Amino acid sequence: MSITKNDKNTRTTGRPTLNEVARRAGVSPITASRALRGVASVAEELAQKVRDAARELGYVANPAARALASAQSHSVAVLVPSLANLLFIETLEAIHAVLRPQGLEVLIGNFHYSRNEEEDLIRNYLAYQPRGLLLTGFERTESARRMIEASGIPCVYMMDLDSGSGLNCVGFSQLRAGEAAAEHLLARGRRRLAYIGAQLDQRTLLRGEGFRRALQKAGCYDPGLEILTPRPSSVALGGELFVQLLASQPQVDGVFFCNDDLAQGALLEALRRGVKVPEQIAVLGFNDLPGSDCTVPRLSSIRTPREAIGRRAAEQLLALIAGKEVRDSALDMGFELMAREST
């Protein structure tokens, strides 16, 4: 087979082209492109023919070429603070399930709870002109805020609420969730209540503030019953901090952890040391992560709508990309207190 540079429908290198895939599948290059991107308007039978042709030829899409051809990428950038936490994995799965059928690639950035790292990721992603941004919370550097605003790219904020800002956001009130935690423990007759928080991102601090306010209102707040550490949340850390709390405050009768993994660690340590839960001390977690209903005793926790937040945030972003008006810019997904055996 002879190959010439003047024939744009043949390749000039050994790399298969989209045009070759289209010819083999018997469709136009545009249809082939849409099929490979998973656009829902392409019939499944036709899309399968295109995928088969691409596989037979060893074709791999070139995102840079696609972006140059359309003057805009087909991607959405999603930034989360951690991929080690199931909280964000469930949210990302929901986002992908909404965006992928629309032919949008999901670019995931993990900024490890670092504002500077998030700023770098935002700068890098904006250079590729994504169709939209999905960001976690409102806490970031001023430089990052300016870049987002100047880009003009649709953006939706997840996990937190700020109805007064006019920003598009999907989440729940972290402050109110903290208050609900305190109210639950108070209703169980507990008065010596502790709060243990790790990582110390804005959401953790807001939960603690809500917890503190409710205790102050009840007249039983003790600042000596707060343990806060910037260390990453984990089961092992939960056990360690629980032991620290019992050693320094033996009269404590209830504790609220900022995340379930910490609370799960506390339950394991209580079992190891013969501390009776909830008879001696009530233990309450947050997020209701998988496994919390299988601990001994079963962990009480505040369930957060992680899947729903991801899904609705992605849907809101699609509406913004399409130029539609979003009436409820601040969408409160609420939370649910799961009262189990540990309280």
Curated annotation (Swiss-Prot):
User: Which SMART domains does the entry mention?
Assistant: HTH_LACI
In this entry, the residue ranges of the DNA-binding region are 18-37
Q: Does the keyword Repressor apply?
A: yes
- Which InterPro entries would you find in this protein's record? HTH_LacI, LacI/GalR-like_sensor, Lambda_DNA-bd_dom_sf, Peripla_BP_I
Keywords for the protein's UniProt record, in alphabetical order: DNA-binding, Repressor, Transcription, Transcription regulation
Domain HTH lacI-type: residue ranges: 16-70
* Gene3D superfamilies for the chain: 3.40.50.2300, lambda repressor-like DNA-binding domains
Protein name from the UniProt record? HTH-type transcriptional regulator GntR
Q: Which organism is it from?
A: Pseudomonas aeruginosa (strain ATCC 15692 / DSM 22644 / CIP 104116 / JCM 14847 / LMG 12228 / 1C / PRS 101 / PAO1)
